[in-house]
Amino acid sequence: MIKRVHLGQGRADEILDLPNLIEIQLNSYEKFLQLDKLKSKKPLLNEGLESVFRNIFPIKSGNGDVALEYERYYIENDALNFTEKECKRKGQSYEAVLKVRLNLQFLTTGEIRQKDVYMGTIPLMTERGTFIINGAERVVVSQIHRSPGVVFYKEKDLYSARIIPYRGSWLEFEIDSKKDYLYVKIDRKKRILITLFLRALGFDTREKIIETFYNIKKIKVEDGTKRDLPGQYLAKSINIRENMYYRAGDKITLQDVEDFLQNGVNEIELVDFDGYNDISGKRFVSSNVILNCLEKEDAFFALKDGSKELPKESVMLAVYGSLFPGEPISIDNAENDLKTIFFSERRYDLGRVGRYKLSKKFGFDDLTTSVLTMDDIVNTISHLLRIYEGHDILDDIDHLGNRRVRSVGELLTNIYKGAMSRVEKIAKDRMSNKEVFNLKPQELISVKPIVSAVKEFFATSQLSQFMDQVNPLAELTHKRRLNALGPGGLSRDRAGFEVRDVHYTHYGRMCPIETPEGPNIGLIVSLATYSRVNDYGFLETPYRKVVNGVVTDQLEYLSAIDEEKKCIAQANAAFNSNGKYLEDLVSVRISGDYTTTSPTNIDYMDVSPRQLISVSSALIPFLEHNDANRALMGSNMQRQAVPLLFPKPPIVGTGMESVVAKDSGVVVKAKRSGEVILATSSKIVVKPFEAENAKDLDEYHIVKYERTNQDTCFNQSVLVKEGQKVERGEIIADGPATRYGELALGNNLLLGVIPWNGFNYEDAILISDRIVKEDLYTSIHIKEFSIEVRETKLGPEKVTGDIPNVSEKILNKLDENGIIRIGTYVKPGDILVGKVTPKSEGDITPEFRLLTSIFGEKAKDVKNNSLKVPHGTEGTVIDVQRITKEDVGNLSPGVEEILKVYVAKKRKLKEGDKMAGRHGNKGVVAKILPVEDMPYLADGTPLDICLNPLGVPSRMNIGQLMESQLGLAGKYLGESYNVPVFESATNEQIQEKLKTAGFNPTSKEILYDGYTGEPFENEVMVGVIYMLKLHHLVDDKMHARSTGPYSLVSQQPLGGKAQFGGQRLGEMEVWALEAYGAAHTLQELLTVKSDDMSGRVKIYENIVKGVPTNVSGIPESFNVLMQELRGLGLDLSIYDDAGNQVPLTEKEEELINKS
């Protein structure tokens, strides 16, 4: 390990160590599968896969005679066909068999038949938090989606409340503020008046509705109160006699008051709009929206004579008709249907989260009921009305209390739920069969829906992604990513600015910096360093508890909901050894506001300054001195750094380098403390101190030169020697892009910030050829080429070195089986695997047919279908793999074997490669200068790299300058530094180090021109900067074509390197050539080099013959245009200067020749 000097303003030690950075994946999958509990035979919790089975079973037959009951499930780990390594090599999935113990119970006879039923295979997660599917490592990204529960919001003039379940119908309430009416919508269908909806749910009288929402006051009817009563609303109906009935909700008139007095009504109950009940302490509604809705009912329904309430039939017709238009209605069925939509566990599920959110909102303790209750509906309506009245506030949809995370375990649980409901349906159908008494449990279960659903999820789901494996940081970040897209999430086109924007609740939970540039900005984000997901799926972040102004060591994890209105101090607030704050006023944040307050008001304190950013951003030293846009680019570009052959850790680090290396899974860590008894390049054997016997040894296999998903090289190197003692968790072998157990993505280079003859104009980079000679930025890239050997209708294909019409020189590189030898250097067009395919009879010439009939099968002609090295690829063959049916057992139909050839290429840094620092300072290598021509320091040390000073002021990423200054001191003092984010070294500390190293405190030095030896006019800033080589290499982009494939319709060359295409000459390029007057160049570009079919054949002929040429015919695109115009019914013909018709098609040519 490297000894680092802590240099910064804060404390070197932190109260809380960083958690395992991939625990979001590991914990979620463990909750889903409960493998640890299965191994230790402990009872399983009702979550994940166990909850799916418990919810579906028992499955009962229609008549109730037969029941299929669930006991438990097993994962057959011993039955794993292949190890992780073999799965990758053979293109298989790393999965185990899932079996479920079922009891088939015959209730009439009491007989029970038990069986362990096969339920398909289930992919297993590797220790690194990945899955291996068809030989490729994949990651299931966590999804951030709208939380189930209730949310209140406003759109234009509509105040809305929405109850979102985990599964089931959406219920929306909306108040039309122009008309003062409240409506309800179920599943976004037609609006229903709220009073009708309430009546359908059982509030069948006006009185019930009014007393549910309004406070009621009793008033004595006397001459004195006579004037105050008109205009008020009755809360209870008054029935004086047959023709004198006053309904609840009716407005009282002066005449009504007179009638009350005359008929001896001494006391009446009225609606009290005060909205607060002094006795119960309960808040009621204070607007007349509900009363308006009761009035509106009367306008819709003409009541029958003498009826005092709406008949049930009318209510059900109105409600059910809006929900299911055109369906015949039976009143009882309609009532049941309406209730099952929300109150049946089969059709509706709020989920644990939905119930938690509702209870939290309305102050209940109930956390078990999974369906809606009448109280939920009433409370939602009351709360919405209070918001409308201005007594309560709207919800913030982008608040992290209203968004939750679905990790891999929950996503898979949902997949299994959907598949098992189909299995249940099939089982019930089979139970209805007359022969049910002869059945066994396994005959009732159909595995197909489960197998196909799981396969589809891992292979095609938007959230199951091919792992980004460029370097360890890219892997780690991919596993910690949160995605708002995907099934049940947002769509790129409809996501507005608000959803993408940074919100104050993201603090300590989601990184405000790391997100892609482009259409996904803000929709794909990263977890903050200390963040974790709680049981309900909400993101939590840790805080230190502050009691009476004293900081304690007690830690609490708070979700965004818990944190609301709490007073939180920053991590760098100064306090003494007793935990008392040193200042009278401390900077704090309360919800989204930043202010200062007295220490006694503080509730919590941040645990670390890097708490609010992601792992990638926390690797950028002096982050606080960079503009946010450049920090974003720096975070993203570190993930694109190619692992180098000889990387070095940065001189100026942040302390996160070792954590990332440890948790990324690319290094080898000791499982137990012990002594190394064997250390070779491919294997380490450790004898543990607590070994029970001589055979109890820990073996570690070292990975050598394997290909990653992105064609970079995965290579581990041993760090320990035989006889060395190692501790548990110690790193004993480095992986790609790690050195001495620290992340090492690039190298430290001596930098001069100086323009140099225009070669570093516009972000271009000038480098010394010392970098190339010493292989500082040399990387290995491994490509895989594969070919299938099939059984065809005409006979099997063969792998052979006996290939027709191929020169001996090319075949020399193949072995006796026709496969390239390992160690051979191959170039484009070389054969890697010789393969011949039988030709069909139609392809055979008459002479061959004669030979076949004389000599039989021996003379059968074959076609050369060999695997060749594609254009633009060369390198050394490092491995060949042959996978046969015997090896795997389930190759695709018709495939006999698969051959894979791995070609490795050492790529040195060259002009056109992209490089970048950690501060978003990216550029392309424009020139590699001989070391003797580079500017040099007074002691003769030549610079390694020259960057343009104009790249700093407008980009505002000053961090790169501070890093360079401290790096310079570190290089000459032989020190490495930890400069934590947001607590980085001050200018004074850097200058002190520079002075100690013998440099000018400004780090400006006199530089000498490498050409002339003369000093430059001004002093130049010199430093040591950490630069990375990015995965945008010129070798992958450079491309040339002479002839190649053409598009079928337009006959123009295809586009792009992958299609071996041409270079597009667009509209503006044509203008440029026109403006220049290059008529002949333009003509040949638009005709013979593009789509003039006859012209290009002639010109090729003439070039071969060496004859000067100037031919051009009609471009094919002109013919396409002509045919389109003819398709519109326009008869067009073309004539040349002599007046002869020019044929456009072969048919036309025949007709012209005939005439």
From Swiss-Prot:
Q: Which InterPro entries match?
A: DNA-dir_RNA_pol_bsu_ext_1_sf, DNA-dir_RNA_pol_bsu_external_1, DNA-dir_RNA_pol_su2, DNA-dir_RNAP_su2_dom, DNA-dir_RNAP_su2_hyb_sf, RNA_pol_bsu_bac, RNA_pol_bsu_CS, RNA_pol_bsu_protrusion
Name the Pfam families on file. Answer: RNA_pol_Rpb2_1, RNA_pol_Rpb2_2, RNA_pol_Rpb2_3, RNA_pol_Rpb2_45, RNA_pol_Rpb2_6, RNA_pol_Rpb2_7
Q: Which domain of life is it from?
A: Bacteria
* EC id: 2.7.7.6
Q: Biological process GO annotation list?
A: DNA-templated transcription
Q: What does this protein do?
A: DNA-dependent RNA polymerase catalyzes the transcription of DNA into RNA using the four ribonucleoside triphosphates as substrates.
Q: What quaternary structure, including any partners, is listed in this protein's UniProt entry?
A: The RNAP catalytic core consists of 2 alpha, 1 beta, 1 beta' and 1 omega subunit. When a sigma factor is associated with the core the holoenzyme is formed, which can initiate transcription.
This protein is called: DNA-directed RNA polymerase subunit beta
The taxonomy runs: Bacteria, Pseudomonadati, Spirochaetota, Spirochaetia, Spirochaetales
Q: Which gene encodes it?
A: rpoB
